[in-house]
Amino acid sequence: MNIKQLGWNAHFESHFENYRGQDLVPARVIRVGGGFYTLLGADGEQTATLAGQLRHGSTQDALPAVGDWVGIDSPQEGGIRIHAILPRQTALKRATVSNRKGLVEKPGVPQVLAANVDIAIIVCGLNRDYNPRRIERYLTLVHESGAMPLIVLNKSDICPETQARRAEIESIAFGTPVLVTSAQCGDGLDELASHLKAGSTLVLIGSSGAGKSTLLNRLACAEHQQTSEISAAVGKGMHTTTHRELFPLPGGALVIDTPGLRELHLWGESEAGLASTFPEVIGFAAQCRFSDCQHDQEPDCGIRQALHDGTLDPARLESYLKQRAEIASATLQSELAAQVAQKRKRKTIPRQGKRWRREHGDGQ
């Protein structure tokens, strides 16, 4: 397989020059699980593990994620090893979520959902999944990643208010395309397929039951991902997709399917994404007399004036303030985690020195 068909471009070519003398070859991560990485490259599909320096010296967000390009060695007795991860063009990150016991395993460390994505397709069902405020959160995530957002309102066949809901989402999308589809009936799929360019990488993100895997199956004309029925009584989807995986489509595009996101906590470095999602709020805030205006009791507040005039939706302001507070909290967590890591490192270095002297003597 030609690696250009997998999204290889001049960016990755230039960064890989540093590794050509190390007898490494490039491959793309298509699946991650159990400490193993499934790769796709010129030699087809292969399975690899991390080389020691990557396994022990990388934070969670620096480990290979689905969509990453990596440098691997030739098959050895111990299997194929990943020795390098090429710099990402884009990365969808969220704050680390709690596990099933309700505990955050690595607070302050982001989780990479997908790497090197050109277009992030935000899929929202037109059933009980429909939630404009949640779509705003996804938009902040995608804007911050560097990928282009595309909103898909799926399941139009069961919604009598399709056009009204499309208009509502367009009013908060600020230029982001909004498509209406029915994965079951095939409506709107041609328009969606027009965004799938050969060599481009897209990711499907959204809640469980929004129809991501069904859309993928229709676009691929094959049952790539098993899909589950939705309970008509509660409108909730079963978590059919249990892992993130990249699929090459017949037309040449590459699509990453993801499990439904139980939690979508914003990462601390999301200020730019927040501004792109709420440009009208930022614009009104710029009209405040004071640069540090809290939009409460200060005189000449652009935000309060916009609320009074009816030119700013109170729900939009509330959503903006909630996201801003969450990002500030995540930033603080990240800073605290960095301080803890630095202290741990300072303690580790003397211990390593003592161990070396015990093993090799004091050099006298």
From Swiss-Prot:
Q: Where is the composition biased (Basic residues)?
A: 342-358
Enzyme class (EC, first level): hydrolase
Q: Which residues are noted in the entry as GTP-binding?
A: 154-157, 206-214
On cofactor binding, the record's note says: Binds 1 zinc ion per subunit.
Q: Spell out the Gene3D superfamilies in the cross-references.
A: P-loop containing nucleotide triphosphate hydrolases, Probable gtpase engc, domain 3
Domain (CP-type G) spans 101-264
- Annotated GO biological process: ribosomal small subunit biogenesis
**What keywords were assigned to this record?**
Cytoplasm, GTP-binding, Hydrolase, Metal-binding, Nucleotide-binding, Ribosome biogenesis, RNA-binding, rRNA-binding, Zinc
Asked whether the UniProt record includes Chaperone among its keywords, one would answer no
Q: Where are the transmembrane segments?
A: none
Q: Which domain of life is it from?
A: Bacteria
Q: Which family does it belong to?
A: Belongs to the TRAFAC class YlqF/YawG GTPase family. RsgA subfamily.
Q: Which NCBIfam families match?
A: ribosome small subunit-dependent GTPase A
Name of the protein this chain belongs to: Small ribosomal subunit biogenesis GTPase RsgA
Task: Give the organism, scientific name.
Answer: Syntrophotalea carbinolica (strain DSM 2380 / NBRC 103641 / GraBd1) (Pelobacter carbinolicus)
Whichever gene encodes this chain, its name is rsgA
